[in-house]
């Protein structure tokens, strides 16, 4: 796998490593964004799959994405650089589940189909069993991803709210926090 970060201008990729072990710079970039202690779990995941990881500028449309191999290019995951550490870890697990699903089933499996859900929940279980997360995050992840409810349900909104509350750098304003009768643009 390879960990890359877009340069300050976001026009070029800076390659960190393309071999089986992350470079010191790649580990630093990853550790900056992951919850404390989760780096070993992530390295274990990455040892099982050959993939490039790109840390990108913040995007409003998505938290991350997976691109399958194309021509001579290896598969690639991109993840936004501004995510809360737990959100970064969940997004990485989400995209790695796509990569594993692609390797096993190719185009025959739906991107968020049964096979993908199996892989994603397996990675989430590893996160939960590791004991690395605060209880509030563990409970919110269980409620959001291990119930039959839609991901747009209030349980997933509660997880999203935890990321916003726990991330002082976040400038997100929730509608429920705006006083009734307020005027805003």
Task: Give the label of every model feature segment.
Residues 11, 22-69, 76, 82, ...:
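Metalloprotease/metallohydrolase-associated module, dominated by Zn2+-dependent proteases
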Residues 73-91:
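Short pre-active-site segment immediately N-terminal to the catalytic Zn-binding motif
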Residues 90-103:
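Active-site recognition of the HExxH zinc-binding catalytic motif
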């Amino acid at each position: 796998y390879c960990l890359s970060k877009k340069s300050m201008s976001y026009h070029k990729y800076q390659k960190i490593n393309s071999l089986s072990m992350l470079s010191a710079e790649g580990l630093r970039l990853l550790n900056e964004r992951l919850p404390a202690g989760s780096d070993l779990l992530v390295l274990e995941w990455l040892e099982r799959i050959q993939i490039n990881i790109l840390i990108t500028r913040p995007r409003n449309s998505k938290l991350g994405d997976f691109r399958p191999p194309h021509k001579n290019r290896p598969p690639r995951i991109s993840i936004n650089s501004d995510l809360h550490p737990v959100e970064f870890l969940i997004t990485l697990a989400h995209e790695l589940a796509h990569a594993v699903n692609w390797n096993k089933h190719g185009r025959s499996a739906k991107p968020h189909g049964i096979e993908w859900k199996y892989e994603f929940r397996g990675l989430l279980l590893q996160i939960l069993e590791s004991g690395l997360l605060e209880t509030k995050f563990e409970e919110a992840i269980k409620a959001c991803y291990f119930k039959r409810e839609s991901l747009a349900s209030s349980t997933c909104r509660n997880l999203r709210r935890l990321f916003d509350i726990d991330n002082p750098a976040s400038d997100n304003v929730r509608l429920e926090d705006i006083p009734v009768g307020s005027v805003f643009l």
